[in-house]
């Protein structure tokens, strides 16, 4: 007779780091093993990027306005989010403050447990199972920032764990609000946009992942293909409440973006220009 084995629920310290997904499976038998999915978890702040395989080429794209209709439609199939992870004793909830897709009808909640060489996630509001695998990137240093750009009223996040980072910058335009629009996919907004510029604006939400090397903070994956191989160049400015990062203008010119730091988790010593700081959580509001 098979005995029930108590599930090992991970704590936040065990979740710290990079997780890759190998499978999502639904009760009707539909599975996905092809989508590239990485989830980077900090002390509570997280970022997540999901990209479909076999996209079009973007070799001639220097900025947002270079994207053609087919490229925009493919970009609209991506997913990604940034926010904070919470746990109520039963369910983990990935609260999304930035979402590449329009706001979902259902919350992003699920159970997590460790099973042999993987971590399993079981959805709460939507029935699914996901298999996650811890990637060896190192667990220190750790620094996470919640950001706000007052110049254009957009939110952002920066998270470093070990030798890897993820960065998010919200879009500058909102989605049309109506009861009929609830639950729509980004591809629907893109397909129904009044012109190509409006469609481009809908996909102009950056969620990037990269590696920290001797050459800098080099972007290796991004929802915006023209950001690939660029150096994020984060710099913490005195009095340690302002962060500057690289950006790309709509026409492909290199630019710098200034952020107000709203919240910090971890040590700012791992951010260029920063004074060493102990591992603490700070808030500037």
Short names for language-model regions:
Residues 1-80, 92-285:
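Lipid interaction determinants
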Residues 83:
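Phosphoinositide-binding peripheral membrane targeting modules
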Residues 86-92:
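A short, structured loop/turn motif at beta-sheet edges
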């Amino acid at each position: 007779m098979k005995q029930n084995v108590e599930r090992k629920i991970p704590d936040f310290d065990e979740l710290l780091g990079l997780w890759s997904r190998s499978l999502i499976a639904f009760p009707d038998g539909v599975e996905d093993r092809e989508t590239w999915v990485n989830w980077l978890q900090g002390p509570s702040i997280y970022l997540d990027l999901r990209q479909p395989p076999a996209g079009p080429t973007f070799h001639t794209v220097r900025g947002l306005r270079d994207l053609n209709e087919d490229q925009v439609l493919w970009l609209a199939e991506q997913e990604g989010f940034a926010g904070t992870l919470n746990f109520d004793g039963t369910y983990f909830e990935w609260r999304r403050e930035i979402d590449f897709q329009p706001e979902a009808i259902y919350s992003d909640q699920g159970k997590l447990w460790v099973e042999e060489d993987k971590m399993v996630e079981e959805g709460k509001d939507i029935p699914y199972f996901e298999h996650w695998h811890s990637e060896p990137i190192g667990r220190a240093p750790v620094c996470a920032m919640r950001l706000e750009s007052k110049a254009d009223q957009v939110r952002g996040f920066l998270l470093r764990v070990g030798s890897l980072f993820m960065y998010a910058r919200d879009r500058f335009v909102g989605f049309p609000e109506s009861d009929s629009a609830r639950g729509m996919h980004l591809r629907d907004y893109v397909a129904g946009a009044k012109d190509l510029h409006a469609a481009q604006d809908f996909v102009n939400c950056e969620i990037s992942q990269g590696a920290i090397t001797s050459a800098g903070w080099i972007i290796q994956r991004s929802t915006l293909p023209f950001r690939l191989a660029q150096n994020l160049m984060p710099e913490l400015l005195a009095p340690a409440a302002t962060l500057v990062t690289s950006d790309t203008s709509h026409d492909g010119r290199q630019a710098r973006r200034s952020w107000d730091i709203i919240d910090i988790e971890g040590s700012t010593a791992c951010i260029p220009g920063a004074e060493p700081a102990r591992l603490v959580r700070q808030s500037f509001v």
